[in-house]
Amino acid sequence: MEKSYSASYAAAGVDITAGYRSVELMKQYVARTMTENCIGGLGGFGGLFVLDCSGMEHPVLISGTDGVGTKLRIAMLLDKHDTIGIDCVAMCVNDVICAGAKPLVFLDYIACGKNIPEKIAEIVKGVAEGCVQAGCSLVGGETAEHPGMMPEDEYDLAGFTVGVVDKAKILDNSTMQAGDVTIALPSTGVHSNGFSLVRKIFDIDNHPEVLQKTFDGMDKPLGEALLAPTKIYVKPVLAVMDELTVKGVSHITGGGFYENIPRSLKKGCAARIAKADVRTPALFDVMQREGGISEHDMFNTFNMGVGMVLTVAPEDADKAIAILKAHGEDAYRLGTIVEGDGVELV
């Protein structure tokens, strides 16, 4: 009996029917992100989106792509996959709002050793939730089965977003000056950076049971705290931009304070921050203690409880914080801009 092509493909480790099943299961989640600007549905060769630039004189598209990194290992060890997609969206959309852009569309890419439809659907459920939080549409994606290249129970996740901003409203730090105020938007935890170090600190790969331990000072098990999804700041930050002049926005990711805050600073300006004013969650204290990590390395690796930093004129600081609080952000004054370069932690 002659084998069909699909049967041969299945014998090679790629289950096409599982792919079809995954798509059917994820449709209900993707539907939550659809708007009147979306044309068609899943299954096309490309995602179609009507670009509405009314009110903009010179619309500029801005794109961003990122992944979740080795935080995925925590999700795999805990067998919890319904929030990791939020992280993927957050890592992309939080970057594009640093230029003042509103995210419009999102696409995801999942590579897996074996397509388990229920697991893939759970991942996409998180991606869709992230898109809802960011106000963008999930217009497409790809799930690639990689037999022989990845273990069956492993996967990788990455995403891509496109946003739009009027050219005249692209964030410009040209007016930044000494005396301006930096505002902190709290993180939910480690977010999606530094997990290779986190795994080493707790020897998670060799002792995954540590994820069930609640350390002194923490109110939840380590695994739950580490897997808390990255916060999406799109709506509160755009709300501030709608009413005030924002001079700089920094998404605090890999490289912590020292690498990311300077990316939004004007040349000749430094961000002075009192370490005592940084509201650092207990999780970071536990990591520093358990890993014997220096304070400098902590601020040079992790967000230390601050997921995003905005810079505004001093007369706008109170109003900016009020707007952020109205959108659910427990924002606070982080520090000030002074003459110099980089970040000064005092």
Residue ranges of predicted features:
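Glycine-rich phosphate/pyrophosphate-binding loop regions near the starts of catalytic domains
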Residues: 28-188
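Short loop/turn motifs at secondary-structure junctions
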Residues: 100-102, 197, 245, 330
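Hydrophobic face of alpha-helices
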Residues: 23, 121-124, 195
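Short, acidic (Asp/Glu-rich) active-site segment that either coordinates a divalent metal cofactor
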Residues: 156, 169-218, 222
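Glycine-enriched loop-and-adjacent helix/strand subsegments that border the catalytic/binding cleft
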Residues: 20
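Glycine-/charge-enriched secondary-structure boundary and capping motifs
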Residues: 2-12, 28, 119-137, 150-157, ...
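Short, acidic Gly/Pro/Ser/Thr-rich loop/turn segments
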Residues: 55-56, 68-71, 166-169, 190-192, ...
